[in-house]
């Protein structure tokens, strides 16, 4: 908007050049998964050009085994996880091209933008009481029985600019067997493994916590299409971290059923007005660095069930890289693809020094649950 007099709006880029968004990068030696994950973490934390549509795709060459990768970064205002995955699916081989491609339209004149901004300001002031009421009601509806004070841990410190990425992998079918045995969901199984893994790392630090507050996604979408914008909210849930993994899973499955019943989308409705209000006073980053509502994020996406191909090459793996912010130094992203379940672990290595140990603990938790749920054959 001109002179910063209103909220940003979407306009067509009449001078769009694909070279501004798609780049090629050689992976540093030795070109293995570890090196690729370091490249991906750096790309995700590299600021997007705000003067253009906020997305970037980087083709990473020089990987072992003749492989190459594509690291796609979307700003959260452009697409949430579901929308981003839908966009990527449309790039895969086998889908027909778009039926029609709309020509770009010129942006509105400055006077119209200024008039619209002034109108929005007047409406915002008139609707302020209702906005505050929705925020209060949304908090009440989405956080019943949830403490606003997550346990204090040394992993919850203001984060810096660096990130590291690692991935734990298990067969999706085996996880479904575990979930079925405990009347749980696949995501419940991951949550049980995540809380156990974080507790294991904290115990090494001399911190004996028994519960964690985990933020899980709540979709406000009506479909899984590639609509513009972010339509996902969050739901903070107090989950057990101590005790036997199977008992913990049973407890988590019960808690998640109770928390999700009748509350889908409640927190999504309050996030936009709440953060808009905080942004007005420049308090967003201050609050995120000091928040005591959650300990970690766990996002989950259902990816393609069948293997994909891109430019004729088989897509061997798909990994989600979600960001961390404020004083949440560790976050987890869950994505299924072609019979596998990938759980990415992204962390600030200056706060979470035990990133490799945390990933190994997560892999151990998942594998142990699978082994105990699989009938022995003899």
Task: Please provide the spans of the model-predicted regions.
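Soluble acyl-CoA-dependent acyltransferase catalytic core bearing the H(X)4D motif
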Residues: 1-328, 334-340, 345-363, 367-378
């Amino acid at each position: 908007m001109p002179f910063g007099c209103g909220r940003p709006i979407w306009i067509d880029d009449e001078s769009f050049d694909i070279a501004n968004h798609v780049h090629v990068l050689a992976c540093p030696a030795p070109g293995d998964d570890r090196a690729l994950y370091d490249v991906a973490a750096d790309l995700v934390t590299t600021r997007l050009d705000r003067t253009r549509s906020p997305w970037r795709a980087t083709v990473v060459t020089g990987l072992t085994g003749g492989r190459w990768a594509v690291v796609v970064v979307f700003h959260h205002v452009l697409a949430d996880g579901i929308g981003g995955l839908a966009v990527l699916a449309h790039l895969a081989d086998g889908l027909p091209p778009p039926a029609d491609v709309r020509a770009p339209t010129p942006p509105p004149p400055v006077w119209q933008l200024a008039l619209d901004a002034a109108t929005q300001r007047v409406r915002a002031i008139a609707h302020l009481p209702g906005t505050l009421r929705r925020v209060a009601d949304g908090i009440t509806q989405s956080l019943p029985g949830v403490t606003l004070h997550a346990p204090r841990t040394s992993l919850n410190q203001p984060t810096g600019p660096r990130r590291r990425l690692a991935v734990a992998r298990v067969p999706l079918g085996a996880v479904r067997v575990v979930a079925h045995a405990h009347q749980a969901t696949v995501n419940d199984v991951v949550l049980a493994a995540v809380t156990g893994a974080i507790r294991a790392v904290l115990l090494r630090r001399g911190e004996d916590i028994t519960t964690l507050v985990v933020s899980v996604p709540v979709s406000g979408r009506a479909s899984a299409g590639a609509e513009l914008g972010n339509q996902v909210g969050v739901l903070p849930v107090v989950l057990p971290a101590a005790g036997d993994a199977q008992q913990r899973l049973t407890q988590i499955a019960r808690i998640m059923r109770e928390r999700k019943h009748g509350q889908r989308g409640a927190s999504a409705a309050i996030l936009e007005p709440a953060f808009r209000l905080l942004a007005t006073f420049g308090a967003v980053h201050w609050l995120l660095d000091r928040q005591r509502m959650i300990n970690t994020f766990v996002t989950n996406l259902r990816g393609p069930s069948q293997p994909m191909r891109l430019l004729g090459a088989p897509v061997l793996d798909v990994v989600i890289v979600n960001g961390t912010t404020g004083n949440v130094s560790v976050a987890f992203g869950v994505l299924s693809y072609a019979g596998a379940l990938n759980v990415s672990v992204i962390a600030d290595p200056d706060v979470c020094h035990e990133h490799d140990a945390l990933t190994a603990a997560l892999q151990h938790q998942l594998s142990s649950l699978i082994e105990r749920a699989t009938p022995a054959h003899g």
